[in-house]
Structure formats: structure tokens, C-alpha cells
Amino acid sequence: MTSILWLFSLAVLWHMGQPQPAELYPSVDPNHFGADGNPCYDRATRQPQRCVPDFVNAAFNLEVQVTNTCGTKRPTKFCVQSGHTGQRSVCETCDDRHEGFSHPAKYLTDFNVGNNETWWQSDTMQEGQQYPTTTNLTLVLGKSFDITYVRLKFISPRPESFTIYKKTHTDSEWEPWQFYSGSCRATYGLSDRAPILPGNEATAQCTKEFSDISPITGGNIAFSTLEGRPSAHAFEESEVLQKWVTASAIRISLNRMNTFGDEVFKDPQVLRSYYYAISDFAVGGRCKCNGHASECVGSSSVDGENRLVCRCEHNTQGADCNECLPFYNDRPWRSGTSVEANECIACNCSQLSNRCYFDQQLFEETGHGGHCIDCQGNTQGVHCEQCIANHWRRPGENYCVACGCNEIGSLSTQCDNEGKCQCKPGVTGRFCDQCLDGFYDFSTNGCKNCGCETSGSLNNQPRCDSSSGSCSCKLNVEGRQCDKCKPGYFDLSTENQFGCTPCFCFGHSSICNTADGYFAMNVSSVFDQDKQKWAGQNRIGLQDTQWAELDKAVAVSDTDNSPVYFVAPEQFLGDQRSSYNQDLVFTLKVAKHVTNQDVKDIIIVGADRQELSTSITAQGNPFPTTEAQTYRFRVHADPYFGWYPRINELDFIGILSNITAIKIRGTYSYKDIGYLSNVNLGTAGVAPSAANPKQATWIEHCECLPGFVGQFCESCESGFRRETKFGGPFNHCIKCDCHNHSNSCEAESGSCICEHNTAGDTCERCARGYYGDALQGTEEDCQKCPCPNDGPCILHADGDVICTECPNGYTGRRCDECSDGYFGNPKDGTECVECACSGNTDPNSIGNCDKITGECKKCIFNTHGFNCENCKPGYWGDALIEPKGNCQSCGCFAAGTRRPNNDYTLLECNQQDGQCDCLPNVIGIQCDQCAHGFYNITSGLGCQECNCDPLGSEGNTCDVNTGQCQCKPGVTGQRCDRCADYHFGFSANGCQPCDCEYIGSENQQCDVNSGQCLCKENVEGRRCDQCAENRYGITQGCLPCDDCYTLIQSRVNVFREKVKSLDNTLQEIIENPAPVNDTKFDEKVKETSRAASEVWEAVKQKTKEGGGTIKTKSKAIKDEIVAALEKLTSIDESVAQAKVGADAAENDMKRWEIIIENARREIENVLHYLETEGEERAQIAYNASQKYGEQSKRMSELASGTREEAEKHLKQASEIEQLSEQAIANATQANKEASDAIYGGEQISKQIAELKEKQNQLNESIHRTLDLAEEQKKSADEANNLAAVSLTNVEAVKIPSVDPKELRNDVAGVLEESENLVDSSVKENSANDELFDEVNRSVADARNELQSSQDQQRVSDQLMLELEKSRERIVDSVSTADKTLKDAEAALQVLEEFGAKIEKSRNDAVAEFAGVEGINQRLDDIIDAQDKRRNSLPIDKQFVIDYRKSADVLLNETHALADRYKDIIHSDVDTRDSTEAVQYDIEQLMEELTDSNENLQYYKKQAEDDKQMATEAVRKATLAKNSAIEANATILAEEDEIKKIINSLDTMEEVNNAELDELEEEIDRLDQLLAQAQLAKEVPTYQQYRADEDVKVAQLKNDISELQKEVLNLEEIRDNLPTKCFNVINLEQEGQK
């Protein structure tokens, strides 16, 4: 594979003239560097990898030692081979003393520039430089290189035989590398291209490939070191080839020159042409570093010489990185490969030695060959890995240290791998030098056991005095062996830091023991699903917490620079005595590293606001950080644990017995966030843990005093109560007291369980519903009350019983009367019922209703009715709605409201929405506004229509009082229907200022249509801002120019008359063709022919004595002129073809002009209507739809009818397009035949008749097209009128009459349905608003595009007019040139000799042909302009019609949308039938939107088809242009032929002057013919015309570019229109919710 790639690279370079072979040496990715930029290490892994220096030209600027150089002994002459035997060689001198003539050896390796090439050159064969004399070129590289190729570029022919040698190393012998010879066998004894076989690849090959003498100069020879070597594809595995490509010096031995064989004649000139000359000696390769360096650098050696060496990596050294550094001998040195870097590895001496050697045997056994010597630190071994005797190595250290074992307490002086000595029984210590804890009496026999109890010993470590054996006990433990609790404590345990737990018993006993049936447990919060009722609190109060799902934590944040605490939920509160001496554990992290700790970071709050607190860092806990950390706090009274205040154990447990809050500080800096998770509080319970059923031995069982009972003496004995009511378990118990009405009481509250209809804590009063004195202590103390519903009563001083709590609506001593605001008669058995006044009465007022009938008497809030349920006349609203006061004044505007009666002061309105009954064209809730486009509301008859002109006004609105429309700039009139004074050009953009020049105008008023100002005499221009032709000084009254300009003016007038006459003549020929039968013309031709014959005979007579030269040259001139005339005829044909193309373009432009202009007017009106009337009407319809709920079937029918009209118009547009295409085809054919008529000859009359007939057909087609367009316009007007009627119907829609009482009954049933439907409607409205905005934007874009089309069309019209004029002038000019050339031919047939006169004729002829060339150039320019114009007009009639159709469809859809809005917005007052109708309308709307999208797709396809038609037209125009280009080439060729004729004439021999005089008359006639052509005078006119054309074309291109952008914008808008409604809901289901 490698060989194939090399051959391919070599072939490519050879064909490109760069025959260097491609690099074959394996390399790494040049961008593959390590993190430090070192390519010898992988960027990502930092692992070593093979690296090589850059591929360079190793010979560049190196000195080449040569054995022969020309010009060194003396200047020598040499001749350059030409390659042609008949051509003389160019000889030069080589002189080494002068730089410009020397060719030294340094030129072999210098920088060569293509246009300034340097070379080395040997002496020539003249100086004896030929076989067997050999010339050697020796290049010393300075160090070894891996060579890819050696390249030589010869200035002389390449040698016939030469050899390339190399030295592998500096001290090695020269060995042949490659032989080149055309005679391999004879010269070197080798076969040509002998095959190289595996196993013998380091063999030089001989080839004759580059030994040919051709090329004479510039020959290349490229030797690739690996070409043809079988193992080249496995280069890295072949040590033979690696050595083969290595070279430290290269020698080129030039043995024999290539010659043509002519040296045998010993001609010095020939011998000097044979020599060796080489311009470039290049050696491609890399500095050899064996894959261990990426660059070579200069280095000073021992002898001070600067040499090239590798900058070695991979722990290697040497000039070629060919050996390992000292101490890097763990494996043998190898060169790096693409697979393995083979870096040298350091010996593993455990950092205890810096000397090692490579041990081959060790390498074979272990794979590591580094053998360490001189180990330090009490070590030994191959890797210094062993300690010497009685020493050991500490973990993480290399050195070994002495064991130091105590001889009394140790069994041996050698320690183990951890440095521990082997101790005797009871002995401990690293060196076995002390007794174990719990042991004493250190001796040679070891130590004795003290017998300490582990659970009672300090820190659970049995420890005693080493002399006496006394044990060290925990705080609450006593005894010599620490085996019992102190009095008042229980539960001796190893898990208790203090040994025993204090007896609490609520202070009622000090004797207790361990209770059975309790197990250890945790109260936990893990926050795996929510925040588990944890709250937050700061100095202000409670704060909300957040659940952090990812962290499984609860979070709080600091917002006011005050600490925020996590507050534990209820499960952590209450009686937590079992948590004493247990741990509170949680995980905490914060958002900021800054922490400000406090002594109140952890707070436990007990009863009566008692607190226990500590710092977050107490008990060795860390500062909170952004990393989650676990915190553990022991709940214990000992000062060691840091709880404040410092109180005794019983008081501490007393706080735990009724915990009201546990607070954990969460934030420690401003705007900090704290995260709490995994909260656990150690406690005990009766339910064992399934995972770890551990006995809870710290739960007490107390021995109680009399009056107390319970496990903890927490309750009073039966018959006893708390000394203080609800005094709690700490309170003492005393006997009960119940005034003889009970024998028992509740222990905590002290309340008696009363009997005898008594109540109270001590039965001191009568129960509810009873009266009497309970303190008497008898059973009859309390009697029953005579009140309704067993209500309470009191005994009055007069002895009567009075009921104190009558039912609502009742009053009186026995509750037997109705209260104010109620009606009924309790005494007759009629209940008291609250008066129903709908909340429209004053609750503080008395007598709001009749107490018997319930009729409301004092209605407020502008209401009336039996129940105050309706608004008063002249008011509207809902009298029942909350809050009250909804009845508002109608406030109808009198001038705009209909009066149903003669009461002018009271104008009623609809009580549901407040809408007044408006006069025609009046709108507003209070009928106080004119509708959009109307005015004069004060008339009392309604509003009058503004009737603003759609073109001249900014919209359809006008002043509501005067009716004045808002006019566009420059427009005036109440209706904005005419241009203001001093303005013109009434259009959709307003009117433009006349801007008449004050000096040149009679006044400032201009023509209202064209804008032409009334100019003073001799002044012209639209603005009257310039003088007439040949006049100057407008400020001075346009004075006439001087006489010289008068003469020029006269000549210009003459020329114009001639051109006009010529145009008239041409037009006469076209209109009145006749057969060419001019007898006088024929006679004149015959007379001229006879004269020419006579002259010719005279010439022959003069030259009869042997002057055949003139005759021959004259005949040649004649033949050349005939050929020129034939080519001119071809030019005529090309011009005719170009004219056909130009006429076709002209017809297309005219057709587009007519169609676009008609469509522009129609669409401009439609667009203006959409922008003004359409948008305003749509807004009015939308407002109406907000008020009314009924749908208009008439609107749907009108919209459907409008769509049918649009389809009809589309069909008619298609017919118009077909007729237009037929008209174009007829016009094109007519134009072609007219062109043929100009050059047609005798058939003109017949063809003119046919043209007239086709012209009539064309006129008929045009009339039909116009008729259809007019019909289409009428249809569009009808559609617009129909849309206007539709909008009027929308305005006329009125709300139906609704019965308020019936509506009130229905509201409750459909209220929920209405709310859902309103939400859906609002969403639908929002979605449709976006569509409405899209419609408006589309309309605006269409308007802009049509305006651009209009401007472009105007420019195109003018351009086509100028094109037609240019074409006529070109035809005239070509005809004149043809006639002139024919006259020249007749004159040249008799020419014999020429003198001074002929020189003048020649100059005139040159000028004539220059004019012809200018005409041709103008023709080419016109064709280019035509081509550009046709390319710039991609929009044709159908395209514009399609856009109009799109605008019509969008208008219809806008009206339909307005209808749909009415059907949707306030449908909450409709029933389910209305809802279904709305759903149906929405589906219809979706179908219409889908149809709209399909229409847009159809229009897009039509536009693409039109674009293809335009492209075809451009292609035809391009063919016409190519024909014109060929005609231009023909004219240029003819010009060259004429110049040749003139040159031939110049070289003719002189003749007698007398003979020239005889021809002078003929020459004068020729001059007159040339002058009549006057082509030179037409050139400036054509040049100016061309400049004008260029300006117009540039403007046209700019307009077309803008138009195309607008088209793309419209297409993008169309593509973005939604194809369907995505918010489809089932309104019936929504209504049932």
C-alpha cells in the first residue's frame, strides 16, 4: 500500500513540474502535541509517542564540494544547446572572478527563483570534461539523515551516465545508492532496472529512465530511496531499509555527457556546447533521531565545531538519540515506531541509588533489566528494596530505620514490616517497653492483669496504676475495679462515656433501674420525596423552605442578613428524655464559604422558652462549606459537650421532657443558602428495629413516693390532683374538692366530674339550660330553663325568667316576636323569615321591609322591585351581582341616540351591557362616536360618510366635525381627491412638488399630470432649469451662443434633417415596398463598369513590356476584397438575426408593460382598501364580535361567493395569458418578416400583405385581451362592493332581546361552561391575531413589490424605445458601409501604382473601418443590455395576476375571520346549540385556511413555471448575443484583411506620375463616397448613448434586485402561514365541564 501511495505522489509531482517524491518516512500528526506543546508526548495522556523532525531540504544552503567548476582557472567560453541542428548556438563566457558570469558550487543549494535562476556549471568538453573524466559533487550533511529523495535539476542536458553514492555514517565508506545510464551494462556492468528481491533490498539499481538527451534544459532527476523496495510497506520492521535510507553524506559522480554525436568532429563550437550545469541539488529528508526527537539543533562539540545534533527526548542521548541516558537502563535501547515510542526507562532503585547497569539475564527473567548498585539508607537488593537485619521501612519512606526493641519486654530484636516488636504477655508499646492498660508490675516475665471492668473504666480502657493496680473509673462509676454506679445513677454501660445514666423520675424519686421492653431507634428525616414539614425561621418569624430534589435536602435562604434556622417538625418535639446522652446527627452544606458561627447555631427549646444551645463547630464539628458534611452532637449536660447554659443533669433532662422546638442554623452569611439532609435524633421506643433490634438499657423504671404512680412517677394517684392546675409531671399531687357534687376529679386539670346538673372545676355553678345556686351542696340546687331549644336563661330581679339566647330572627323575653329585617308571626305558628332585598338595602336602617309581607321598602344603589332585584330606568347593570352598586347610568349621547318616546330627559339602554340605541353610522356604548369613516354626529340624524379618496388620503377617516380627510403630502380637498397648488402627479404616494425653477419659469404652477412647468422663452426642462440648445446663462435670459456654435448648430440641424430624411425614406420603403427595377441605376452601373474597363485596358497597355507585378498584386487585392465582401454579407445576416432577438425582447417588454400597468392599478386599489378600509372594517367587526353573540349566515354566504368570484377571475386570467402568448408569437413572427422585408428584394410586396393580415390578427388579440382584463376589473370591483356590503351588515348586527329574569335562572346552569368557553375563545382569538398580523404584513409587502414593478416598467419602456432607435441607426450605418465597400472594389480593380494621393485614401479607409468597428461594438453593447433586461424581468403577467388573486383571497379570509370572531368571543350566554354552531364555523375556517395554503402552493408553482419561461427567453437572447459576437469577430477579421491590403499597397513598386494623374479623377470620386457615409461623426453620438444606456441598466439592475428581495419575502411569509389549527378542542366537552 505504501508503494502505491508513493508512486501516485511521484506521478502527480512529475506532471506538475515538481518531481520531488512524496515523503515515505512514517510520521505522526503534526498537530498532535502534548499539553506542553512537545510533539514527543501525547496531548491527552502525556504518554510518550514517536516523534520526528520536520521534513526539510537537507541540502539547502550547504556547501557542496565539487571537483570541477567553469571559469576558476581562466575565463572559459560555453555555448548553449538549441536543440535544432540548423540553428546556431548562443555562446557566453564563464568567469569565476565576476559574479554575473560565475557559476560556483554554492548555486547548487541556494534559493532558486523562477525568473532568476542560478546554477553550477563545469568546464566544457573543449577543456576535456568527458568520459572517462569524472566530476564529483559531494554534499556533507553534518549528521545522519533519513533520506526520502535526491533531486537534481539540470540546465544542461542530463548526463548519459552518473552515480549517486552515500555514506551511512561519517566514518563509513562510500557505497553506491543509484546508477543512471543509457548503457547500464556497458558502463556499470549492471542490468537495466534489475529486480530488487526480498533479502537483498540494500542494492543499488541502474536505470536508463533519465539518460536521454531530451530535454535540452530544465530536465529533472528524482531518486526515491524506497522506490521498488519490497519491504517499503513495512519500513518500521525492516532494519535493512532503515539503514538503506540513512545517509550522512551524498556524492553525485557525473561520468558521461549526453551528446548528439557531433563531438567526434572536434569542432570547438560543438565541444563548447557540452558541459554539466545543475541549478538545484535538493535532498528531501528528516534529521535522523530514531523517533526520539522532534528537532535538530546546532551544538558545539569537543573540538569547538558547531554540529547538528538531535534535541533528544524519551530519556535518550547521542547525536542521533541512539543510546539511553545513564540510569535509564531498565530495558535495551530501541528506535521509536508509530506503535511504540520505545522510550528509555529509568532503573527502579527505590530512590535509594543513582547508579545502575543493564542486566540482560535479569531482563530476560523479569522484563526489567536495571540492576541497582551502591544502595543507600540501610537497604540492599537488585532494586534496593530490602532492609538490612534489625531494620524496617516506614510506610511511604524509602530509607530503613533500626527496630530498637526493648530487650526486657521483647521476645526478639527483629521487628515486623510495621516496625512493631514482638512483646511478652501484658507488655505493649512499639518497643515493648511498658505494661498494657489494665496491667501492672513490668518485669522480664511481662505484666500482671488489674481486673478492671471495661464498661466502668475511663474511655472503656481497663487502665490501672502500674504500681498499685487501682483502676481509673468513669465519672458516674465507683469501686476499685469500676464495677458499679454511683447513688442516683443506673445502667453501667460501655457505650456511656460517663458509665451510668442519672435517675430523673421528674424529681419525685432518686432510685431507679433499667426498664425492660425498650429498643434503640432514631427519629429521622431523609427528604427523599418532600421537605417533610421542616420550616424556616429568622429574626422576623417563620420563613418558607424549599425542597432540593437533586440534593434530597430541604433548603433555606438568607435575604435580610439575619441567620435562618431549620425548624424541626412535630416528630422531633415533645418528650425526648430518651434522647439524653444520644446523638443529634445531620448533613449540612451552604452556598458560600464565608461563615460566621455563633453560640446559638443549634438550639433546643423546652417548656417556658427554656433553651439549650451550642455552636456549629462544637464537639469537633467542621465549619459549614459548599460541600455536604455530616455533623454529630451528643445531647448531654457535661460542659465538655458545650451546651449553654451549663445546668445540672436533672434540669437538662427536664428541658428534654417537653421540647417545643429544635432549631438548626442553615445560613452563615448574607444571601447564603443552606441545605439540610439526613437528620437523625437518637432515642428509644417499644418497637424494635427490623435491621438492628438493639436493647435500650438507658430507659429508667422509678420507685415512686405516695401520691405518685407511673414508670417515671409522672402521674397522680387516684383521688389526687396537681397542686397547680395543669402543673405538669414536675408538680406535686394533692387531694380533690367538688362541693359534694362528685367523688372524683381529673388529675392534671383538677376538674371534678360533676353531677346534679352542675358544672365548673369544683361543681360550683349550674349547668347550661339550668338556673339556681349550686354552692348549697344539695341535689335540687339547679332547675330547667323555659326557653326554646333548651336555651340558657337568667333569673331576673323581679322573679321572672328571661331567655338570653333567642334564635336568629326572634326576640322577646320568651323569643316570641320577629326581629327587624324578618317577617312572619310566631304567635300564629308562622316562622320568622329574613327579608330578600337582594343586598340592596342599608343594614343599619330600620324598617327595610314589611314585617308581614316581606316587601322591600328602602332600595338603594339605583335599584327597584319587590326584592330590589332590578336597576332603575335609565340605568343598566346587574342588581344582584357582588359587590353592590353595579347599576350605572346609561349616559346616552342625545344627538346620537334614537328616542323611542317623547321623553327627552330619559334615554334608556340595554340593561345587560348598557348599549344605547344608536342612530345610523353611530357607534359606542353611549352612541357618542361616529363609525370609522363617518362624521357630523351632532346632526341628530346619524353620521355622514367621509368618502375619502383611497389614493389621496392616509386612511378612510376624517375630522369628526368638518369631514376633512387626512391627506397625503401634496394632496388637498375635503376628500383628498386632487393635488394642491404647485404639486402634480396624483397617486397613492400623494403629489410631488412642482419645484419650478424661479428664474426660468413663468410661475410656480406646473401641469398636474406631467409636472411640466411653464417655461420662459429659450428655457426648457421639466423644472425650466436649463437653457435651450445653443444657449447659455439662464439667469441672463438664456443668451445665444457665439457664431461658431451657430455654425455647429446649423451643421447639427443639417445632419438631423438628413437622418430624418433617411428615416422617412426607410419608412417609405417599409410601408410602400416595390420591386427593384431602376433602369437609371442599371445604366449607371454599366457606365461605371465601362469606365473601369477602359482604365484597366490603359493600365495593361502601360505595363505590356513586362510589368506583371502590378497585375498580380491587383488580382490578389481583388480576391481579398471579394472575400471581405462575402464576410460583410455574413455580417448582414448576423445583424438581421440580432435584430430579430431585439424585436422579440421589445415585444415582450410592451406586453409586460400593458399587463403590469393594468394589474398595478387594480391591485393598488385593492391594497389601499386593505390598508385603510379593510383593516378598519375588520377592527369594527372585531369590536362588534366582542359585544354580540349571534352568528351571521349571510357573511358565510358572501365569503363563499367571493371565493367563487376569485376562481372565476383566475380562469379568465388563464385565458388572458393564452391570448397574450399568442399575441407575442404573432408579434415575433411579424417582426421577423418585417426584417426580411428590409433586405428581401422582389418579394417585399407579397410579404407586406401577409404582415398586414397578421397585424390585424395581433390587433384583434390585443382587443380581446383588453376586453377580458376590463371584465376582470369589473368583477374585482363587484367583489370589493360585496365585501363592503358584508362589513355594513356586520355593523348592523344588534344584540337580541334578553329577559333578565330568565337569564338569571340560566346563568347558574351554564356558568362553569361559559368560563371554560371564554378561556378557549380568548386563546383562539390570540392565535387568530397572529394570522391577522401576517395578513397585514403580506398586504404591505405586495404593495411594495407592485410599486417596484411599476418603477421598473417605466425604465424598461424607455430602454426599449432607445433600443429601437439604435437598431434603425445600425441598419442604416451597415447599409452605407456596404455601399462604400462596393465602390472601393470597383476603384481598386484599375489601380496600378500609387503615390502621395493613395496615402490619403488609405487613411480615409482606416477611419471608415474604425467607424464600422464602433458600430459593431455598439451592437454588442445593445445585445448585452437586452440580455440583462430580459434576465432582470422574472415577473410576467400571470405572476402579477396571481399576486392579485392572493390579495383577494387574503381579503376574503380577513372578512371571514371577523365573522368567526363574532361567533366565538361572547358565546357564554348561548346554550349548547350555539356552542355546536361555533365549532362548525371553526371547522369551516380551518378548511378555508387549508384551501388558502393550497392556493399559495399553486401560485408558487405558477411563479416557478413563469421563471422557466423567462429563462428560455434569456437563452434565446443569449443566442442572439452570440451571433452578434460572431459578427463582431468577422468585422475585426475583415479589418485585418484591409490592413493587409494597405500594407501590400505600401510595398508596391513606384509607377509613373503621369499614370497616377489619369486615375486622380476616380480617387476623388472614391473620397466623396467615403465622405457621404459620415460614420465617424456618428461615433460620439453612439458613445454618449452607450453611457446613458449603462446608467439605465445599472438602475434597472438595482430595481430588479429590490423586487426579487420582496418576492422572496412574500414567499417566506406564505411558507410560514400555518397549515392547520393546532389548538383544536371539543367545545361540547368543554361546555360540560
UniProtKB/Swiss-Prot annotation:
InterPro entries: EGF-like_dom, Laminin/Netrin_ECM, Laminin_IV, Laminin_N, LE_dom, LMN_ATRN_NET-like_EGF. GO terms for cellular component: basement membrane. Disulfide bonds join 287-296, 289-310, 312-321, 324-344, 347-356, 349-372, 375-384, 387-400, 403-415, 405-421, 423-432, 435-447, 450-464, 452-471, 473-482, 485-500, 736-745, 738-752, 754-763, 766-782, 785-803, 806-815, 818-832, 835-849, 837-856, 859-868, 871-887, 890-909, 892-916, 918-927, 930-943, 946-958, 948-965, 967-976, 979-991, 994-1006, 996-1013, 1015-1024, 1027-1038. GO terms for biological process: animal organ morphogenesis; axon guidance; positive regulation of locomotion; tissue development. Disruption phenotype: RNAi-mediated knockdown in L4 larval stage, causes ectopic membrane extensions from body wall muscles. The keyword DNA repair does not apply. SMART domains: EGF, EGF_Lam, LamB, LamNT. It comes from the Eukaryota. The keyword Hydrolase does not apply. Residues 47-286 form the Laminin N-terminal domain. Residues 287-346, 347-402, 403-449, 450-502, 503-512, 702-747, 752-784, 785-834, 835-889, 890-945, 946-993, 994-1040 form the Laminin EGF-like domain. Glycans are attached at residues 116, 136, 348, 522, 658, 740, 936, 1077, 1183, 1226, 1259, 1336, 1452, 1528. Residues 529-701 form the Laminin IV type A domain. Residues 1-19 form the signal peptide. During the formation of neuromuscular junctions at the larval stage, negatively regulates membrane protrusion from body wall muscles, probably downstream of the integrin complex formed by pat-2 and pat-3. This is Laminin-like protein lam-2. The gene is lam-2.
